[in-house]
């Protein structure tokens, strides 16, 4: 059985849940045209999504996906050879390449490395909260949720403080929603939309910067994580220069974008639920369990990174040819009433660690999940202890994206 192509409008980027309710009622997988002009088979069911994320017949190799996206869009995406190399990392590779890359990177991302960051994250959170003191109104994204992960990840890799704002701008442009053919009156002035040419230019600039950073660090090895990646080896195997560039890009971008949203979305959920806010303020030991529920309820990633059918497959009775794109909606899967008793309510405990798909599943499970959890836990502990009466100052607007799920800003009155 095949399915007709369903066109998803711009509103899907801001508020996808009504769309997912309709799709789920019709079946677990659908052929959709995303607002960015790319068609994909979209899975909205938890169990099927979990299976697809771990399926060997569904590949992630960037070199195989690139011609498929070009064919589906009917045009080249404007990426150059230099910028395309940024995407050749472990998240866009299949075994045995993926196995090799993850093994090497894991040597630098140990539990010991994460544990050693605890004091620095605490100090950073305190410093940021000190800066807010006395302000009538603050934006918790710009003032708190963003600085924590971007500072931590940049310090880990030795990215100079003077370069971090530009890095953040380039990251935002590269991960922005396609501005071509989008029906959104805000697209022209929003930093969360970008043309193919703008994304390509940002990719080239970032790639050039990373090449220079790696060259400088190779000559001046230190204790930072980049130095560890340069030195990482397994039985004589090391990351090549191109692999280092791609891996550094992946960790720097994924290492802050998702955690910003985890902290921001969790704070928004608390600000909308005063009873829960009061409960966690009085019982901070419950914050780790609350974070797992925040990850399920409003996770930091909307739709999984692209996969493709390496051969014809059948999902839930739907025949999908080879060389088609497949995506899993992590938001939809985590709101599946077949998996969660109260999918649209925050219920601490219904999404114990490993019970949601916010960090993915299978061999591509997020290698930075322990760091994200630590940053989020300390961020929540510190701000709840400091500002028990904080409240929303105005309505928030979501970032228009099928990749990330996060608010554009989070204005609050502290007390």
PLM segments and residue spans:
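Cytochrome P450
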Residues: 1-415
